[in-house]
Amino acid sequence: MPSRAVRRCPGHLCKEMRAPRRAQPPDVPAGEPGSRVTWSRQMDFIMSCVGFAVGLGNVWRFPYLCYKNGGGVFLIPYLLVAVFGGIPIFFLEISLGQFMKAGGINAWNIAPLFKGLGYASMVIVFFCNTYYILVLTWSSFYLVQSFSSPLPWASCNNTWNTAACYEAGANASTEIYPPTAPAQSSIVQFWERRVLRLSSGLGDVGEIGWELTLCLTATWMLVYFCIWKGVKTSGKVVYVTATFPYIILVILLVRGVTLHGAVQGIVYYLQPDWGKLGEAQVWIDAGTQIFFSYAIGLGTLTALGSYNQLHNDCYKDAFILSLVNSATSFFAGLVVFSILGFMAVEEGVDISVVAESGPGLAFIAYPKAVTLMPFPQVWAVLFFIMLLCLGLGSQFVGVEGFVTAILDLWPSKFSFRYLREVVVAMVICLSFLIDLSMITEGGMYIFQIFDYYSASGTTLLWTAFWECVAVAWVYGGDRYLDDLAWMLGYRPWALVKWCWSVITPLVCMGIFTFHLVNYKPLTYNKTYTYPWWGEAIGWCLALASMLCVPTTVLYSLSRGRGSLKERWRKLTTPVWASHHLAYKMAGAKINQPCEGVVSCEEKVVIFESVL
């Protein structure tokens, strides 16, 4: 029998209601959300999230931002934005997938008017999957080259080197080269002239490199065979891709701290500069890094959550995963700056000269560092294996999230046995064709357009803002907490609702506005400025996702029937699945005693017909 406290809760379930919490949904026909495949073990979900969210940005972006923005002081805005911005949306996306039992698009049946959020996320994650794999392609190329002795980037005695080349670790001022030619290290020339075969600009695309084509093909094939059977197999692969990087990071840290100059590097990394707290850019960098590293706004966390058991404690999972993500970023900084400190001492320069972020750290700074160490091949192989594992974990789950959304939309009457394998192959083939443009001589310029615009902080912040609006304001923050109370067995902290309703949207919109106001045209290496049409392509990529939300809202409202109020009401009425009906009907029987002339049986019919 329900308690008196439960009977006094009109309209929805109270947190005190426990009876329906463990009630399982009725048998559901195949294809319905209730028959959805789930993780073999809950640890598969945890490791998949770690493999996806803990990626290259934790290793090559966070340490540099921490150093640039006041060292240890940067952790203050970073943690504040994480608590009030990153973690609430991280939890929102995972819990939404688990509650709706659907991927990034159908999960927004909770507020159908905002289903454009799902399409926006899928556009972003498709672009991200397409260009992100180039980093893995370059890493695999470097990995193969790392078995050479001597390392090919350590000397100037190669066919791709010019007269302006000087060897890594040497003093450029002692080398003789034409006075009109700028000096370039052997590391830079290997990267630009051997790997990228860099052309003069975006208008000079050039030829496709056959070596990178082989690396790209091999990488995509590895991705395909790891995810083609779904989470039952990919959930096992991520045990390797998610854990192996930590083993290598520990090995690199042990090696790094034994190098001369490592302490100075770590001091540079953590030394607080309290004056930085008053600079807006520090807070903006902290917020942008949180949204990047937590993989928010891509719809993939929603897809991963949809494979959870319905009553899994995703609230606890969200906090654990957020902690692991941020702790990994901090730990990676110790590794990176211990080695950068060694480089600075060896070359007799300030650490600001060698400090890099992004591809510059992975393919220039670190390869240069290993040339200064004994047994450089060993450290090069370990480093690039780590990059591959970090990148593959993110790539597996990113493609999985996109494929999940497509399969959720696929009409059941057109399903066949190998549907998933075919869809995965089609998605990868399409991405591969686009990637071919990025392994040409002008491919780096195309890669940067995708990186700067398609999955930038602007698009992610825009998506995250509307996610909060759709759940907290349209569906209702209290209403969603009631649903979570049924799903989890306890009510999440009320602060989460206030974050979704007020704090997180303000954080998102504040950083979004700052990005637009302080927009700077895209350049390559601070020397090449993109033509106007290159920027136009970039903004088209950004708007392709951002316009999904307002376009679908306006289209849905304009195509509906009845008054504007009636259209709004209909389009904001959730579309429930069978497991929701079991839960909602249990709540209706407890909280809404039959009154008036309408019988209980009639209420059930009305309820089902409306939904």
Curated annotation (Swiss-Prot):
Subcellular location, record wording: Membrane
InterPro entries assigned: Na/ntran_symport, SNS_sf
Cytoplasmic-side segments: 93-122, 229-246, 303-318, 393-421, 478-497, 559-611
Main location (coarse class): membrane
Taxonomy, superkingdom: Eukaryota
Keyword Secreted recorded: no
GO MF terms, alphabetically ordered: gamma-aminobutyric acid:sodium:chloride symporter activity
UniProt membrane topology term: Multi-pass membrane protein
Membrane-crossing residue ranges in chain numbering: 45-65, 72-92, 123-143, 208-228, 247-267, 282-302, 319-339, 372-392, 422-442, 457-477, 498-518, 538-558
UniProt entry keywords in alphabetical sequence: Glycoprotein, Ion transport, Membrane, Sodium, Sodium transport, Symport, Transmembrane, Transmembrane helix, Transport
Residues bearing glycans: 157, 171, 525
Matching PROSITE patterns: NA_NEUROTRAN_SYMP_1, NA_NEUROTRAN_SYMP_2, NA_NEUROTRAN_SYMP_3
GO cellular component: plasma membrane
Known role: Required for the uptake of creatine.
UniProt record similarity statement: Belongs to the sodium:neurotransmitter symporter (SNF) (TC 2.A.22) family.
Protein name: Creatine transporter
